[in-house]
């Protein structure tokens, strides 16, 4: 289930310590867990995306990922997660192991078994004009998620 929009690529990390290890070598990580807990917050902030087997739109992983602006897929119930073996078996039989490069799309829930070249979103001139008008004519200001801008 898509839970936080955007896409992220990196090496699969199935523990908080593995994300931290990858980060120390400037390697992008995708955190995969059965579910996240508050102890995972550091790894979540360092990862380029998250995938959990359990959870829904109001689960810990989904709420934290949206707040941090990190792509996230939750409730991937059609997969088999073998935590001890550090593998994730997809419904089509493909196996993702810790260290594999993958890409996740938090907008659609898609998992790609390779590192997909990503590009940052483009700001159109129409959107820029709309923001300019809003700035000129607004009587109030709205501030939200300043840490993700």
What feature does the model see in each segment?
Residues 1-29, 34-149:
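Acidic, glycine-rich flexible loop/linker segments
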